[in-house]
Design a protein with these regions (language model features):
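N-terminal acidic leader/helix
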Residues: 1-25
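Short, charge-rich amphipathic interface segments used for partner binding and complex assembly
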Residues: 20-51
Length: 52
């Protein structure tokens, strides 16, 4: 993850509900290819936490 992505995932982990926090944990553990796949499946969460 790059610095901007880390900030967004950190926001998910800190401010999210149980599902967003679980997504954040997944993002922390994924390699680049799987990170892109998961991000594509849940774009609404990515958008929400990128705007906070």
């Amino acid at each position: 993850m790059n610095e901007e992505q880390i900030i967004i995932v950190d926001k998910m982990a800190k401010y999210g509900g149980s599902f967003a926090k679980t997504l954040a944990e997944c993002f922390y553990r994924l390699d680049g290819n799987n990170f892109r796949k998961l991000r594509a499946v849940f774009p609404e969460y990515w958008k929400e936490y990128s705007e906070k």
